[in-house]
Structures are given as structure tokens and as C-alpha cells.
Amino acid sequence: MANISKSVKLGVFTLAIMNVTAVVSLRGLPAEAEYGLSSAFYYLFAAIVFLIPTSLVAAELAAMFQDKQGGVFRWVGEAYGKKFGFLAIFLQWVESTIWYPTVLTFGAVALAFIGMSDTHDMALASNRYYSLAVVLIIYWLATFISLKGMGWVGKVAKVGGMVGTIIPAGLLMVLAVIYLASGGQSQMNFDGNFFPDFSNFDNLVLASSIFLFYAGMEMGGIHVKDIENPAKNYPKAVFIGAAITVIIFVLGTFALGIIIPEKDINLTQSLLVGFDNYFKYVHASWLSPIIAVALAFGVLAGVLTWVAGPSKGIFAVGKAGYLPPFFQKTNANGVQKNILLIQGLAVTLLSLLFVVMPSVQSFYQILSQLTVLLYLIMYLLMFSGAIYLRYNMKKAPRPFRIGSKGNGLMWLIGGLGFCGSLLAFVLSFIPPSQIAVGSNTVWFAVLIIGCVVVVAAPFIIYASRKPSWVDKDTQFEPFHWEEQATTAQTAASVSGAAKSSASSASTNAAGPVSQSTPPPEQHK
């Protein structure tokens, strides 16, 4: 057994690459290319105040509760109770549901560029009805495949991650180097300011979406026990992974800015246009349809993998009595069919915003902002909960601990993550000046109503719980404060029984006692 255990241990660089693969996506590069050289500042800033804190805090929490299920529900619930734990995992599930239309919009645009006519491709990519049709067809196809429980989906996803993300990212950077080295004129002003113009407040708004680029790093915390000497090596893996991620994002963004003028940058199309322009420059336009297929394949493979994934967490919690039996139904393959169908209905309704918003780009941006807002609420709970547990569960074993002694480093790391998340949360409500989002009323209505409804829903569901919702076959470990209450109650019962026995023995020794004598007082 020792050899088996040892054989599955991850190396520092292996874990770092796993973290990079989980986070890096090229679809967000055009949003930051709008900022030119200062985009590097945003990437570095978000990495310091969000990416690294998320990775380290999640690692400590995951290691603390490695033998207990629930994920973020467990982490937040241990600190603030079941109600807020349910809110956290509900937000995580809904956020992923809203994410699907945005990532599939990018996939639809990629598919539109398979043709050889730039004019036709760009017109098709901008067509709202085309994007709506592609999003719905691909999503429901992915849902159908997930319900079938096909094992080959995982293999497709692994290939898709390499073909649709890593290879295109490297190719984009190589093309930029070739372009500049051969005398190509850069459209990005590298003499500009590294630090953005903070006096222009709405310039920060679009950049707040960069936090979503790094979202999901908390998932890497589950591997904290799979690495040798986690206290020393896990932080190394985090910092190496963060450095590689930032380098890919910065150089990828620069590569787009070099070939596309800032005024022509489009959030959904510019990545494909950038590749098109580079391929024309090196006289290899025939590669454009191939890279479009590769990018689309990467998107579709990711959706196939994750369409059922995030719903598994809410499904497990639901079986513990937090969701009605309707949501606990599975099919013959053991897949949570009703949750997937409800998820699909939500994706369909959200996708209909294509018809309301003035453009595909504005639809993409408003859903991205709503996704950021919901995810950030969960992160605010996670960061503050981690600090709170340092005092509420002082003696709990921490196989991986931020700081060897005291709580100062946790306050620094967790506090940095909390403040960064709070700043991004506030900025995300403001419409970006760089994108025509149509009516500001629609913008604020979608974001505010969306947040209120999604946050209120789990509290309403929690208040409506019934004993019949609990699946008798499920085994969900109690929270530490529930165990303490049970232990205290048991101790009180044992103490009471001991006192009662002692009293009876004393009474018997003294002789018969009147039947009217009251029983010993029970202390709580």
C-alpha cells in the first residue's frame, strides 16, 4: 500500500501545470487588450490580490476537511452555519450555469470563422440568432451526452484542453514574435503607461472581469494531500502556476494588441481576427479555419466535461435534505437528471437575452459581469470564513497551514483576497464605457435583479425544508459545531444519570423515602 500511495504523489511542477490548465482560457484576452500595456498591471494585480490568496486559502480549507464531503458548502458552513454554506454552494452552481452561454458564445464565434470569407465570417459571428441557435444546440447536446454518462467525454476534454487552449496560446505568441522580428508594425503602444489612469473610474470596470479569469483555483485545493510535503511544496506549485498563468495571459493579450488596433477590438471576435491577421501576414491563411475548429473544439470539450460537474456538489448537498426530492432524482446511469434539466432550462432562458441586448458583444459582457458578481459573493464568504475558523476551530488539524505560527499571515492573505474580491464586486455593477451595452436600465436591472434573486433563492429553499427531503441512504458528515452539541448533550445525559444513580444509592442507604420527593434537578 505504501508503494501505491507513493506512486500517486504529484510533483510541484505537475500540480502547477494542473492549476494552469484549470484556469487558463483564451476567450477573455480581447477584453484586456483594450487596455494596451496597462493590461499587464491588471493581470498582476488580480494575481496578487485574488489568484494566489484563493489558491492558498482553498488549500488550507480543503486539507482541514479532506475526509468530509461538501466542498465550499462545508468550508462556509463550518464557519457561519448551514444556511450560509448552502448559499455558497448554490452560488457556485448558479454561476457555472450562467457561465455556459458566455463560453458557448465564444465557441459559436469560433465556428463562424471556419469559412474563408472574412466579411461573411464576421457578419455571421455578429448575428444574434446564429449565436443563440449554436449555444442552445451545443448545450442541449452536451446535456444529453452527460445524461448518458459516456466515459469517453473525459478523454475528449483532455485532448480539447491541449488542442483548444495550450497549443493556440503558444502559437499566438510565436506568431507575434515572428511579426515583430520581421518588421511588422505594432498596433499597441509599448511606450504607454504600465499603471492605468485611475482618475477615469469607468476604465476599471471592464478590468474587474479579469477576476473571473482566475476563478476556479479553489478546485486545486483538493490536491493538497496529493503532493509530498504540502506545507513546503504546495505554495511553490501555487506561485509557479500563478507565474505561468500570468505570463500566458499577458503575452497572449499583447499578441492580440500588436496585430489589432485598440479601436477595432471586439470581445467575442478579436481572438479569431487576430489569428486571421497573423496567418495572412505569414501567407498561411489556410490555417485560419483549422485554428477556429481547434478553439471551438476546446470550448465544446470543456462544456461536455463540466455540464454535469458543478451540479454534482449541489446534488450531494440536496440529498442531505436541502433540496426537494424532485432535484434528487437520478436516471439509470446515476446522473442527476432533474438538476441537469433545470440547469438546461436556465441556460435557455438566459440565452434569450441575445434577442434583448443590442449585440452579441453586449450580451457576452453582461452575463460575464453577472457571473463575476455571483462568484465573488461566494469568495467573500470563503475568505472571511477561513479567517473566522482560525479562531472558531483553533485546535483542528491543518495538514496545510498558511503561516507556521499565529494568524497574522492568514489575516494578510485572506484579507487581501477579501478586499480584492470586494473591490471587484463593487466595480462590476458599473457599465463599461468601452462597450455599447444598450440601455443602462437593462444593464442595472439584469445585474441587480439577478443578484437579488439568486442570493434570496437558497434562503427561501432553506426555510422551506422538510424532514421528508432527507435521503435516508445518504451519509453526510455533521459540522463540527453539531458534533460539539451532540457531545455536550451526551455528556450532560451521562452526568445526569451518574448523579441520579448516586442519589438513589444514597437514598437506599438512608432508608425509605416518601414518594412525593421530587427528582434531582437536571442541569443544562
State the predicted function of each range:
Residues 2-109, 211-212, 217-220, 227, ...:
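Transmembrane helix-boundary motif of multi-pass solute transporters/channels
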Residues 6, 130, 156-159, 329-333, ...:
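C-terminal membrane-solvent junction of multi-pass transporters and transport-like membrane proteins
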